[in-house]
Amino acid sequence: MVNSEQALHQHDPAPILQLDKVSKSFGPVNVINQVSIDVRPGRVLALLGENGAGKSTLIKMMSGVYQPDGGQILVDGKPTTLPDTKTAESFGIATIHQELNLVPTMTVAENVMLGRTPRKWGLVNFKHLRRQAQAALDLIGVDVDLNAQVGSLGIARQQMVEIAKALSMNARILILDEPTAALTGREIDQLFKVVDQLKEKGVAMVFISHHLDEIARIGDTVSVLRDGQFIAELPADTDEDELVRLMVGRSIENQYPRSAPEIGQPLLEVKNLNAEGRFTDISLTVRAGEVVGLAGLVGAGRTEVVRSIAGVDKVDSGEVIVAGKKLRGGDISEAIKNGIGHIPEDRKAQGLVLGSSVEDNLGLATLASTARAGLVDRSGQHKRAAEVAEKLRIRMASLKQPISDLSGGNQQKAVFGRWVLAGSNVLLLDEPTRGVDVGAKVEIYNIINEMTEKGGAVLMVSSELPEVLGMADRILVMSGGRIAGELPAKGTTQDDVMALAVSQVDDSITEEAAAEIENTKEDR
Amino acid sequence: MSTAVVSQKKSTTASKIGHWMLNNGALVGLIALCVGLFIATPHFLTIPNLINIGIQSATVAILAFGMTFVIVTAGIDLSVGSVAALGAMTSAYFFAEVGLPGWITLLIGLFIGLLAGAISGISIAYGKLPAFIATLAMMSIARGITLVISQGSPIPSAPAVNALGRTYFGIPMPILMMALAGIVCWFILSRTVLGRSMYAIGGNMEAARLSGLPVKKILVMVYALAGVYAALAGLVMTGRLSSAQPQAGVGYELDAIAAVVIGGASLAGGTGKATGTLIGAILLAVIRNGLNILNVSSFWQQIVIGCVIALAVGFDVIRNKTSK
C-alpha cells in the first residue's frame, strides 16, 4: 500500500491540504474512521463512495463546518485547525455546493463580490465592482454578462459565477460537491474545460461524483471510502468494476435482496399522460407484485411523472387508472383513497414534519380517515403506529420522540409506515434510499419486497443505477420528458440504461425542455 | 437519544423538577411573580384583586386562544383587534339602529368575525398572499368599516351582549367566557383532526399536503376560527361597557401575539398550546395589575412588558439549544 502510494504520487507536487487519520463521530455513530486524504495543487482528487460512506462529512471537515474528533488537518504541511468556515476560507479553501450560495435577485458582478463590495465614501463603487468581477470571470474564461441577474441564468452559468466568486477570494483549493448532478452533457463538458484550466493554474480540486466515467475523465486520483473507512487511493482511470467492488465491498446480490413474487393484474395504469414543459406521452403499467424502476438523468421528468400520478401536480391530458378505476387527477386525497402512497424525493422538506413525533408522522395520512365526528382516534392511531413501527423495525426511543432525532434510514421507514397504515397498495417511490446508510437500505428493500409479496405494485424512481438494476423487475428509462425505452432487469447493464437516458438529451430541443423543467421546479 | 432516556430514568427528583421548570418557564415565571407581588403588597392576593386580574386578562386571552390556532400553522393574524371591534360594532348597530333581538345581534357579531377571518384565510390560502399582508389589510379594512358604521361614536349594545360583561352568582362572565374559549381551544388543538392537522401544516406544509391533508381548507378554517374568537373578545369588551366603542381593541393583536409567544409557541409554526397561551395572557395581566398596585406609571409598564416578551422568547431559545 505504502509503496504503491509512493508510486502514485512520485511526480506530484507536495500536498497543500492534508487530512491525517481524521475521525468523526455523531453520538455513538462513527461516521469517519481514521481517514487520510492529500490534496495537491494542480490535481483533481475524486472522492468515491456510496451515500453514507462519509464523503460529505469529510468535505465538511475540510471546509471548517465540522471539526475532527481525532487526527489532524495540515495546511501547507503545518498542523492547524479549521474551527469555522471563515478560517477555512482564509486558507483558500472554498466549497461549491450543489445548492449554490448566490443571491438570485442581484447581478453577476454583485454576487461575485458579495461581502467584499468595493466602496467609495461608504457607497458602492460600481466601477471597481465590475472591474474586479470581470477579472474573476476572466480567470475561468467564461463569458457572462456582468449586469445580468443571477436568477435569470441557467444553473450551469450560476455555477460558473460561484466558482469565479471563490477564485476571486484567492481560493487555492476548490471542493466541488456533485457539480454535475444538475447539468446536461454539454454543460458538463464546459465545466470540465474550466476544471482543466484551473488545474493548469495550480488550483487543487476535490471532486465528488457518482458517475465513474466523469471521474475517469477529470480526476487524477480517486480515493474510495466505504462506511467511513478509507479503502484505497488509485489512479482515476482504474477499471470501473474494480472501483465499484471497492466502493460497495460486497457482491450486488446481497445488497439488493429482491425476491420476485408472482406477477398479477395491472394495479397502476398510466395512459398518454402529458404536461407541457414537464413530460410528454407517458404510458406505463405496474402490475401487482411488480417493482418497476423509472431511471433517467436529473431533469428527465421522472419526479414530475410520479408527482402527477400521485395527484400533486395537474396534467394537461391522459389517464391514471388504479385497480381499474380512473382518477380525476390533480387531487392528492383522491389518489390516497384509491391506494396510492407517495414517498417524495426530499424526505425532510416534503416527507416529514420534523418537529413532530414519530407517532404523529406515521399517522399523518390516516388522521382524517380513522377519525370519528372530526375527533382523532387517539388510542387507535397510537396502537397502529406502535404495530407498524415494530413491523418495520423503526429504531427509536419512543413513539413520542421527535422524528428529527432518528437516523435517515429510520425516518424513511416512518414515511413508508405512513402508507402501510393507510393501506396503500400502489407505492410511488422517489429516490427511496437517498441519504440512507447501507444497512438501512437493505431494510427498506425488504419493506419493498414485503409490499409486493402482498400484491402491491411499486414504481420506483432512483438515480442510483445499481439500485434500479438490483431491485426493479423492469426498468423504464426516461429521457427529455419521454419514456425512451424499457429494459428487463436481468442482463441489463448500467451502460444500457445510460445509453437510453442520454438518447434525447443531446439534441438542443430537449435541452431547452430540460431547462424549462428546472425553471418550473424553481417556481415551486 | 437512548442515553438521554437512561439518564432521565436515573435522574433525581431535584433534576426532574429542574427539567420541569425549564419546560414550563412561563408558568414558573408567573408563580414567581405572584409570590413576589404578594410579598411586596398583601393587597395582591385578595379575592377581589384576583377576580380583577381574571377579568382584565379575559379579552386578551380570548384573542390569544384564536391567535394560537393561527400561530400553530406558522401564520400570523394582525387583524384580531380590529375584527373584535367590528364584530361588536356590527352587533350593536343591528340592535340599536335596526332593532333586531339581542341574542340575534350577538350571533351576528360572531358571524361577522367568522366572515372577516374567512376572507383573510381565503386570501392567504387561495390568493397566496402572505398572512402578514392579508391580515394587515384586514386590520385596516375592519377598523375602517367599524368607523363607518359607528360614525366614530359609541353605540349601545344589546342586553344579551351586556350579559357577557356582568357577574352572575359571583361568577364574572368574562372569566367564564375565557374558560370556555380556552377549553374549546384546547379541545380543538389536541383532540380534533382539524387541530392535529394545524400542527402538521405549521411543522411542514408540503409534507402535510403530500399526505393528503386539505391544507387550503384548513387554513381558511383557522383564520375563520381566529375571527370568531376575536368577535367573542370584542363582545365581552362591549358587555363590560354596555356599548360598542369604535376604537376598541386597538393594538390588542400585539398583546395576543405576545401571550401566545410567552406561552411557548414558536412563530415558525408547529408548536403552541392552549394552556401556554392562557399562562401568557394571565402573566401579562398580572404584570399590569402588579405594577398598578405598586403605583408604577403605565409608561413604565410597557417597558416591563417588552422586556418580559424578550426574556420569555430568549429563554425558549436557550431551552431548545440545551435540549439539542
Swiss-Prot record, chain A:
Keywords (A to Z) from UniProt: ATP-binding, Cell membrane, Membrane, Nucleotide-binding, Repeat, Sugar transport, Translocase, Transport
A GO cellular component entry from the record: plasma membrane
Matches recorded under SUPFAM superfamilies: P-loop containing nucleoside triphosphate hydrolases
Membrane topology of this protein: Peripheral membrane protein
Record InterPro entries: AAA+_ATPase, ABC_carbohydrate_import_ATPase, ABC_transporter-like_ATP-bd, ABC_transporter-like_CS, P-loop_NTPase
Domain ABC transporter: 17-252, 263-505
Pfam families: ABC_tran (PF00005)
Domain of life of the native organism: Bacteria
Protein known as: Ribose import ATP-binding protein RbsA
Source organism of the structure: Corynebacterium glutamicum (strain ATCC 13032 / DSM 20300 / JCM 1318 / BCRC 11384 / CCUG 27702 / LMG 3730 / NBRC 12168 / NCIMB 10025 / NRRL B-2784 / 534)
Gene (UniProt): rbsA
